[in-house]
From Swiss-Prot:
This is Nucleoid disruption protein. It comes from Enterobacteria phage T4. Signal peptide: none annotated. The keyword Transcription does not apply. The gene is ndd. Keywords: DNA-binding, Host-virus interaction, Inhibition of host DNA replication by virus, Modulation of host cell cycle by virus. The keyword Transcription regulation does not apply. One of its GO terms (biological process) is symbiont-mediated perturbation of host cell cycle progression. It comes from the Viruses.
Amino acid sequence: MKYMTVTDLNDAGATVIGTIKGGEWFLGTPHKDILSKPGFYFLVSKLGGPFSNPCVSARFYVGNQRSKQGFSAVLSHIRQRRSQLARTIANNNVPYTVFYLPASKMKPLTTGFGKGQLALAFTRNHHSEYQTLEEMNRMLADNFKFVLQAY
């Protein structure tokens, strides 16, 4: 199993939305509309691998929420140090680049992982109402390792 890298994210179509440090936005805060989008948010540190292709440190997913807090709620959990991962991110004084990837673009990282372009074209998409973000999160854990997350 390999570590997920920035190349994997770029190949899937992820976009950079900003940088955090200690659970706070560093160098500017993205608009709330961006932070409330459902999908996956990946944290990348330059310390997580070679500078040309750093490894992904952690991943978080956000579903449709009535409160529309989105990734802001994840940052709140980090600031409150509600898990070992949150305590590490809050205390290690490392800046993390935040990449966003909507669920509609997850195929190359989940069911299509490791397949060539032709096979990927015939691999099913995640359009089932029963295909949850939690299931996609588990597929990511099956296909990749993350620097700060064991699963």
